[in-house]
């Protein structure tokens, strides 16, 4: 590391100093050097951070925009940043995130958490628009005002503050006739969760942004509670290892995992991965407090099904049989292995399930929606067998 251009940064929890490191944030080399760990505050270090130079680097990388995000190059180029300089993104946005209350403070900045945090301070609507559409002019603004730089996922999305609350807007994929239906699945999956009694985030549909259909949901974290994806706490061993870990946390965590397996089998969620479920952390104590609500169901309920399926039951059935879960082998086997008496009661409610078409002015065509309803009912029957 070239000492003459290296800068010292401190990872903080609110304003509490946790760890100071030195790095050249403008270099392609992501090496860093730990200067100090504040032992008196060690209990407040991020639960998903390993105290080593490689561990700090991994933790920082989790706080930058993913390379597969829609419009990522457009967003970064408009503010003079590059994916090839991940630590430069951290330096610019202070490592701030709407997942938690940690941040990365440059030596001598004079900043405080109150001054820069994303929960209380205004977002840049210009940057939000670029993040969602890919269009916009180059701008000079504080990147600490843009939560998009630390939001995961590949779909176009942005955050907006409305009436004192923070909402995530998320679009769909585009380019082919079978794409762009993810927002509908977010809405309809929530309706299934409601009937089952599963703890899931509420989604609505809107065309508020650029007249493009997108899903909208309220932020579920706050200055009181953080979110950690389970994959950052359990790094190997799959669902079995996660179950064993949850058993150490308490029965409510085990119940939540079992409910998720049943729910995902019903909605045929092909994109449940170790980044979109996890735990909530009490920020006052930095301890795990509860299972996080379920979210991110755009790749469920056959959102990628081709237009030829919706008037052809045989073709749809054949297509549905090809869909598999991402994190384990089989929807029904995993759900049945986790079934408890309470799940039978949940599933009985789905035997005559119908979507609430009155919940939105934007609905799928009746033939498509009816076929999905029938499949939800069928999958409930399979689990009850």
List each model region and its residues:
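Conserved protein-kinase catalytic-loop segment immediately C-terminal to the catalytic Asp
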Residues: 273, 278-280
């Amino acid at each position: 590391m070239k000492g003459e251009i290296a800068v010292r940064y401190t990872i903080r929890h609110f304003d509490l100093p946790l760890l100071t490191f030195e790095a050249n944030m403008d270099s392609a080399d992501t090496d860093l050097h730990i200067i100090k760990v504040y032992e008196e505050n060690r209990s407040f270090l991020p639960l998903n951070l390993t105290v080593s130079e490689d561990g700090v680097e991994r933790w920082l990388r989790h706080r930058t925009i993913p390379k597969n995000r829609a419009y990522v190059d457009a967003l970064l180029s408009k503010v003079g940043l590059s994916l090839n300089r991940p630590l430069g993104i951290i330096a610019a946005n202070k490592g701030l995130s709407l997942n938690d209350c940690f941040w990365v403070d440059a030596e001598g900045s004079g900043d405080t958490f109150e001054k820069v945090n994303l929960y209380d301070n205004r977002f840049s609507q210009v940057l939000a628009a670029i993040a969602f559409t890919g269009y916009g002019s180059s701008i000079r603004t504080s990147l600490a005002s843009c939560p998009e730089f630390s939001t995961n996922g590949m779909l176009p999305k942005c955050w907006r503050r409305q009436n004192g609350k923070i909402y995530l807007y998320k679009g769909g994929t585009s380019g082919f006739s079978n794409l762009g239906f993810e927002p509908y699945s977010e809405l309809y999956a929530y309706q299934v969760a409601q009937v089952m009694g599963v703890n899931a985030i509420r989604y609505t549909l809107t065309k508020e942004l650029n007249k493009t259909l997108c899903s909208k949901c309220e932020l579920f974290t706050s200055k009181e509670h953080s979110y950690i994806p389970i994959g950052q706490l359990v790094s190997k061993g799959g669902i079995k290892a996660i179950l064993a870990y949850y058993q150490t946390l308490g029965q409510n965590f085990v119940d939540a995992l079992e409910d998720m397996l049943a729910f995902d089998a019903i909605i045929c969620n092909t994109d449940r991965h170790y980044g979109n479920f996890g735990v909530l952390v009490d920020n006052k104590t930095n301890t795990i407090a509860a299972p996080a609500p379920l979210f991110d169901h755009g790749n469920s309920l056959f959102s990628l099904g081709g237009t030829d399926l919706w008037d052809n039951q045989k073709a749809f059935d054949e297509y549905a049989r090809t869909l598999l879960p991402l994190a384990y082998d089989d929807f029904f086997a995993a759900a049945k292995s986790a079934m408890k008496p309470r799940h039978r009661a949940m599933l009985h409610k789905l035997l005559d399930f119908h979507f609430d078409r009155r919940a939105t002015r934007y609905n799928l065509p009746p033939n498509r929606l009816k076929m999905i309803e029938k499949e939800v009912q069928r999958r409930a029957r399979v689990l009850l067998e």
